[in-house]
């Protein structure tokens, strides 16, 4: 039986069985609460597990949705169904404002920021008179359909789990899209994502707001199920509980959110009843138990519990690739009259250290130029200056006649500059072809709504056809459906080249592409690069393998201590005394 069939049968049983009279209402009510919590956890899977942004304040967004609906329905007589879009809009606007500030933080400052506004929201909910102050809001009307009030746990069960089902589908569709791959790239760091055109701040804000809107929907459901609100349900401790659900279930797994929500909600109910009896005194002992549980899971199953469950299910089928689909168009071919890339007096400092000092050289159209030098010579720093990751402090960098030394990596990528990295930057859990498809990010246009509704399928077919063509070009078509993390280091470097080629660049920057490759693989790579040159693409390559460089490059530029000490044809550079002294240690 396929994984899809198992999922459909399980979902059908899950939706029908709780409606049977033989199932106690207590358990149905518990499942209602699990569904509400699962909505928040799904958002946290996208935000934290996939996007790498830890949030302890997600309960505040549940509160925004709940209190908006509570105030509108009790104070102004608005229908709960009309209050739903208002609740989601208020939550979305609040997330947009808070996210515009918060998502730009990095490291431990981001979770600290979420704690700060989580505490602030808690005090707002508990002190504003319109929200009932510390007494909260009571007598919130229940949902109704066609005059039938959804009072009781069984009717509400249907509403809650329809919402959860739609949220799961939307989240899965989002992750299987151009935008979803960009979100996954965030967790690996901004440097690689920026290099193939992902707008980091915008992408972070999109997933932040989407996760908040799911929490706002959960708040709306909670308000009309509980029918009373108090600020205590939306404090930082509740936010930590939601984060625990995502981590326990599997922080990067959508179905893990359901598993984590179920496990934590049931355990909380059981522990709140039994632990006070065990200790002979009342108290929040379940928090201690959850702390122990979290430590145990982080030690024994760092990816959460869902991957353990997934191993018992049939293997997921590989994504079908329509190689006949038309490839995505690249940027217009750039053939300037002068050099394609020109550096003039480029200088880069890090504090008192001058990493690159007044370097000048040019790369012509259809030319392979190698940049060599001992470790610490400034080669990768120069690459970062050209690609906009670490802009030059002084000097000029021109591409196709236009200055780019102050442009962002995204804008430089749009001009037709692609690069690889000294330290491989792939997403290990994604397949090879999905990693390569990231390189075509700039050529797609589908946004959040199109991704969730699967209106982007034609664009996706073209993106994956482009990725498949580039994998075939570099000789890795047979590995396209393997997880990138399963490849050898040398193969990973070639995958990075295929990803860069998906941009269809005019200039390709390669940082140590032959490292980790066997001799035959190096020969094959050299043939690929010669083929690119024959088609008019320019290549600037940093490499330590002198045999590889000497047999490939048209010209070689040599750096030492951040300064250019030689430039010329391979034979000329090889015999240069300064190069022999600096790069080869004086050995003739």
Indicate where each model-derived feature is located.
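The feature captures the beta-strand-to-loop junction immediately N-terminal to the Walker
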Residues: 372-374
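Catalytic Walker B motif of ABC-type/P-loop ATPase nucleotide-binding domains
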Residues: 508-512
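A short, surface-exposed alpha-helical micro-motif characterized by mixed small hydrophobic
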Residues: 549-551
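Helix-to-loop junction immediately C-terminal to a conserved catalytic motif
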Residues: 387
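Conserved ABC transporter NBD signature motif
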Residues: 395-404, 414-415
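Transmembrane alpha-helices and adjacent helix-loop boundaries
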Residues: 1-325
């Amino acid at each position: 039986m396929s994984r899809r069939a198992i999922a459909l049968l399980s979902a059908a049983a899950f939706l029908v069985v709780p409606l049977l009279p033989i199932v106690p209402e207590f358990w149905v009510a518990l499942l209602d609460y699990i569904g509400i919590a699962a909505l928040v956890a799904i958002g946290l899977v996208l935000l934290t597990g996939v996007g790498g942004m830890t949030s302890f304040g997600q309960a505040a967004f549940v509160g925004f949705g709940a209190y908006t609906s509570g105030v509108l329905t009790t104070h102004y007589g608005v229908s709960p169904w009309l209050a739903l879009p208002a609740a989601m809009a208020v939550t979305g606007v609040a997330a947009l404002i808070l996210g515009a500030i918060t998502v730009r933080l990095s490291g431990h400052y981001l979770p600290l920021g979420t704690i700060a506004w989580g505490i602030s929201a808690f005090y707002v909910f508990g002190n504003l008179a319109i929200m009932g102050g510390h007494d909260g809001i009571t007598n919130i009307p229940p949902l109704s359909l066609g005059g039938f009030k959804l009072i009781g746990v069984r009717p509400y069960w249907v509403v809650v789990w329809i919402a959860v089902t739609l949220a799961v589908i939307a989240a899965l569709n989002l992750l299987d899209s151009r935008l979803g791959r960009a979100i996954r790239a965030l967790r690996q760091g901004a440097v690689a994502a920026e290099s193939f055109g992902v707008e980091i701040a915008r992408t972070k804000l999109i997933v932040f707001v989407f996760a908040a809107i799911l929490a706002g929907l959960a708040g709306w459901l909670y308000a009309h199920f509980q029918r009373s609100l108090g600020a205590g349900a939306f404090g930082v401790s509740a936010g930590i509980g939601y984060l625990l659900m995502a981590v326990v279930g599997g922080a990067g797994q959508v179905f893990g959110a359901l598993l984590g929500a179920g496990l934590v909600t049931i355990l909380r109910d059981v522990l709140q009843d039994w632990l006070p009896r065990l200790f002979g005194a009342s108290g929040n002992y379940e928090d201690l138990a959850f702390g122990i549980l979290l430590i145990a899971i982080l030690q024994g199953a760092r990816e959460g519990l869902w991957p353990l469950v997934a191993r018992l299910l049939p293997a997921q089928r590989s994504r079908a690739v329509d190689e006949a689909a038309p490839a995505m168009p690249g940027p217009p071919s750039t053939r300037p009259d002068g050099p394609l890339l020109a550096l003039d007096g480029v200088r880069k400092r890090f504090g008192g250290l001058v990493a690159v000092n007044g370097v000048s050289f040019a790369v012509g159209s259809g030319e392979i130029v190698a940049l060599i030098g001992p470790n610490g010579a400034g080669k990768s720093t120069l690459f970062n200056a050209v690609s906009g990751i670490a802009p030059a402090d002084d000097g000029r960098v021109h591409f196709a006649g236009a200055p780019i030394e102050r442009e962002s990596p995204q804008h430089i990528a749009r001009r037709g500059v692609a690069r690889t990295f000294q330290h491989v930057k792939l997403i290990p859990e994604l397949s090879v072809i999905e990693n390569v498809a990231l390189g075509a990010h700039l050529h797609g246009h589908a946004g959040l709504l199109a991704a969730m509704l699967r209106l982007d399928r034609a664009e996706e077919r073209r993106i994956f056809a482009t990725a498949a063509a580039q994998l075939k070009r570099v000789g890795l078509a047979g590995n396209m459906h393997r997880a990138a993390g399963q490849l050898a280091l040398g193969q990973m470097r070639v995958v990075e080249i295929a990803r860069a080629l998906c941009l269809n660049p005019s200039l390709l920057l390669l940082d140590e592409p032959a490292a980790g490759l066997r001799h035959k693989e190096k020969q094959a790579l050299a043939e690929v690069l010669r083929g690119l040159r024959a088609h008019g693409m320019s290549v600037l390559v940093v490499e330590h393998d002198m045999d590889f460089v000497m047999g490939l490059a048209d010209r070689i530029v040599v750096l030492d201590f951040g300064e250019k000490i030689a430039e010329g044809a391979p034979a000329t550079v090889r015999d240069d005394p300064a190069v022999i002294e600096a790069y080869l240690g004086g050995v003739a």
